Amino acid sequence: TLSEGFSALFAVMLYRGEYNRRPLFPERSAGYGAILRYTVPITFTAIAMPVSQLAESIVAANLLRSAGLEATALYGIFSGCAVTIINLPVSVTYGFAAASVPKIAPLASSGDVQSARAAALKAILITLGVAIPFSIALYVFAPLAADIIFRSLTAEQNALLVRLVRIMSINAVTLSLTQTASACLTALGTPVRATAVQWVTCALRVGLAALFISRGFSVEGVAIASNIAYFVAAAVNLWYIIKVKANSNALKSKRRSV
């Protein structure tokens, strides 16, 4: 709470510093409708993950308990240990998602859709170039990471953690791609699509987790469900970007022919 409070205070100070600077030319102020068009979808996108994690924890814990397993311990190793390790490289690539927005949004707002899409695809390629080595490293060095970060685990718990990290190592790629592609869709002026994909992904993740646990996959089923959900999210986001680019090029060709 304190860290978030200091972060918010620092952001306000930076904003006030920028606000007090007088621009060389008068700027047109954005209306409330234009602001809400972006802030509302972004807000719903941000709350999708916590809501899905809460739902997943309830569903997974109850199903694991009904199967006669140690629900709290098993899901705790997944959410508290495996996800923590996976999120370390994902947090690095989050910077690419944040940095891509200021470069893509002006191009999209000016009508240069082709350049905006090219910038989006470039950001995605950079994300891939960083995430793939991280994914390989997670798979190869999962035992070492488990020993260093979570030394208090028993041998059986450590072995489970290593299996979960190796299963979810692909998430370093798919989750990173989902973040960057979602940010690119928002910058391209289609934040509602990014929000819809995020909520569908979360629902798919919870549903698949319940299915796999009921089929006897135990907590590994939650990890597999996460892999499938984020792969679908990354693929759909990329498809949206490529599809819109193709539609834009087709529209330009039609206008030229007219």
Language-model regions, residue ranges each:
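Alpha-helical transmembrane segments of multi-pass membrane proteins
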Residues: 154-181
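Membrane-interface junctions at transmembrane-helix termini in multi-pass inner-membrane proteins
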Residues: 172-200
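Helix-loop junctions and terminal segments of transmembrane helices
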Residues: 90-110
